[in-house]
């Protein structure tokens, strides 16, 4: 084991956040070493229990720009203009995310993104070691032991500081807990998810509209499909763990076929391997992680899902983690010692992480229960009118979170005010013909200040 340099950082986890942080820090002169428990996905293929599709929003793209990684990533992304809502009876309807094609989100395959960021991290000067599972940490001595699970051989290092970018099941978080309790709490949803696939057409290309997130809302449960650049869609079914229907009552491939035939009839013929994939892919858990502390003075820090994992229903987990990376790099520039930088990072990000965790839970209810509800559709219509009239004051929730980089905590607070305005203004109305615009103008100007960045 060799001594560490004064500007060296050791990252645990070479996933998306770990690789992006490695790029940012290496470009700013840090000596960065990354340890990853799995093998190199560029050699052995990508392995993960995580969702294989992600939604990239403006705040995530901004972070990629800071790392010089945007062009490499966007070459692999597919534009999504909005939600294509599929009712049980009737034709699908597109609900645009924004005003035009300047306000869209992007679907990207997790494996392609991870490989692109890995390449860029190594090009920036970071050293990445694979098959290194964190086993033991001596925080006082600055010592860590890793195990290569191929041969059970230990590998020991000295470190100045550890940064945990190793996800919701973080090994570094577990080690920190043993040293000093972090107040860890995880609240699991009573729903889980399972992933399936829509293959491309025989001659290539998408079987359904490729530039949309497809959504089949069914009250207590729902199905979504996100496009990939190869013409496939990743389909995710979110279903209760108990009750009818649920994962408890839909265990076999044949039971899954019956569920889709009844509740998702237009999706069923698009998924030829439904029976096989249902039986091969175990359900994934959905939960929200909170901690009282994210760091151990200057010796260790958690970022991204390792610090604040969230449910996936706002498509912001990766975007939030990427924001973490930029915020941490900035705090490291602004402070002379790691303990101060880590404390400032946590103070800057804690409220925003809690806000997007709450909004992600709320968005699940909207997606599964409300997108085909007449009251919701009327409120959405009014929201668009209010944005057109007062674009810097009445900024839709989705715009603040996805197309702008408004702090999540500010977006949450403004969204709650705007929701109240929409509900009160549309109560008792079937359309907008009798809306009192003068009264609404007074309410909007009284309750909503102009928002930085809105236009």
Curated annotation (Swiss-Prot):
Domain of life: Bacteria
Keywords recorded for this protein, A-Z: FAD, Flavoprotein, Monooxygenase, NADP, Oxidoreductase, Pyridine nucleotide biosynthesis
GO terms, biological process: anthranilate metabolic process; kynurenine metabolic process; L-tryptophan catabolic process; NAD biosynthetic process; quinolinate biosynthetic process
Entry GO MF terms: FAD binding; kynurenine 3-monooxygenase activity
Pathway: Cofactor biosynthesis; NAD(+) biosynthesis; quinolinate from L-kynurenine: step 1/3
Known cofactor(s): FAD
E.C. code: 1.14.13.9
Catalytic reactions on record: L-kynurenine + NADPH + O2 + H(+) = 3-hydroxy-L-kynurenine + NADP(+) + H2O
Matching InterPro entries: FAD-bd, FAD/NAD-bd_sf, Kynurenine_monooxygenase
Transmembrane regions listed in the UniProt entry: none
Protein family per UniProt: Belongs to the aromatic-ring hydroxylase family. KMO subfamily.
Role summary: Catalyzes the hydroxylation of L-kynurenine (L-Kyn) to form 3-hydroxy-L-kynurenine (L-3OHKyn). Required for synthesis of quinolinic acid.
Protein name: Kynurenine 3-monooxygenase
Gene behind the chain: kmo
